Swiss-Prot record:
Protein's name according to its UniProt entry: GTPase Era
Region (G2): 41-45
Segments of this protein annotated with the region G5: 154-156
Membrane topology category: Peripheral membrane protein
Domain Era-type G, first and last residues per copy: 7-175
Source superkingdom: Bacteria
Assembly with partners or alone: Monomer.
SUPFAM superfamilies: P-loop containing nucleoside triphosphate hydrolases, Prokaryotic type KH domain (KH-domain type II)
Primary subcellular site in the record, as a coarse category: cytoplasm
Positions in coiled-coil regions: none
Chain intervals for the UniProt region annotation (G4): 124-127
Function (record text): An essential GTPase that binds both GDP and GTP, with rapid nucleotide exchange. Plays a role in 16S rRNA processing and 30S ribosomal subunit biogenesis and possibly also in cell cycle regulation and energy metabolism.
PROSITE patterns linked to this entry: G_ERA, KH_TYPE_2
Length: 301
């Protein structure tokens, strides 16, 4: 009886903030793992998404966007997380946006040139490029920057050519035993995923109003006698004015955030969820490395 060969490897998804890395990861996995929002810097942890298909297991590392800006402790730690992801993988997917090329893209490229892993260039949001005639010269410019394994124009939002990326990934997975059972889609705990869902809703419903000085701590996550979960989430902000913003007029904003977060949690955990949210002012947390460690920002560096 012949034993079927299995293939397994780690793939880093890298790029400057807000180019669509999290959306691409979610499409590759077929469901939502990494939070997506139109604000830059929404991914703060290295989330591992796992996709197993027959003998192939691809383990995706969703990095925070690499930044030139390193003034705040949180930005320094996010850059460290992103850079460390690049060093220990079989393959890198470098995501750029349409015909835009910025100093941040250049910085990511320089880090990739120093690395050993082959790089797929995913040119995202090509469906949004107004001047289609600009696309080909831009792709030629990108091709001249380094020796990419492949250059794939994609739309992570619609899923266009995402299967092409997945196919290239499968071809480059080394022969190895699978790291995770086939039904795993992430190595993160439910508690962690609950905090990410709440944070996504904060980003979505507060938009540009709220600065990045907001995070979520899950104070309680227990199963109840109804077979569901009781979850208490604490939203930390830096100033009293931000607290009022999160709560909204007569509590309307936090109520909406809670309702939408609960829906996503119930879908993800496949069980009823009772969710309660509080807002607390904890000034200076984004500048304090000790506070960031206690909130889990450096647990995987």
């Amino acid at each position: 009886m012949s034993i079927e060969k299995t293939y397994c490897g780690f793939i880093a998804i890298v790029g400057r903030p807000n180019v669509g890395k999290s959306t691409l990861l979610n499409k590759l996995l077929g469901q939502k793992i990494s939070i997506t929002s139109r604000k830059a810097q929404t991914t703060r942890h290295r989330i591992v998404g796992i996709h197993t298909e027959g003998p192939y297991q691809a383990i995706y590392v969703d990095t925070p966007g690499l930044h030139i800006e390193e003034k705040r402790a949180i930005n320094r730690l996010m850059n460290k997380a992103a850079s460390s992801s690049i060093g220990d993988v079989e393959l890198v997917i470098f995501v750029v946006e349409g015909t835009r090329w910025t100093p941040d893209d250049e910085m990511v490229l320089n880090k990739l040139r120093d690395g050993k892993a082959p790089v797929i260039l995913a040119v995202n949001k090509v469906d949004n490029v107004q001047e289609k005639a600009d696309l080909l010269p831009h792709l030629q410019f990108l091709a001249s920057q380094m020796s990419f394994l492949d250059i794939v124009p994609i739309s992570a939002e619609t899923g266009m050519n995402v299967d092409t990326i997945a196919s290239i990934v499968r071809k480059h997975l080394p022969e190895a035993t699978h790291h995770f059972p086939e039904d795993y889609i992430t190595d993160r705990s439910q508690r962690f995923m609950a905090s990410e869902i709440i944070r996504e809703k904060l980003m979505r419903f507060l938009g540009a109003e709220l600065p990045y000085s907001v995070t979520v701590e899950i104070e309680r996550f227990v199963t109840n006698e109804r077979g569901g979960y009781d979850i208490n989430g604490l939203i930390l902000v830096e100033r009293e004015g931000q607290k009022k913003m999160v709560i909204g007029n007569k509590g309307a904003k936090i109520k909406t955030i809670g309702i939408e977060a609960r829906k996503d949690m119930q879908e993800m955990f496949e069980a009823p969820v009772h969710l309660e949210l509080w807002v607390k002012v904890k000034s200076g947390w984004a500048d304090d490395e000790r506070a960031l460690r206690s909130l889990g920002y450096v647990d995987d560096l």
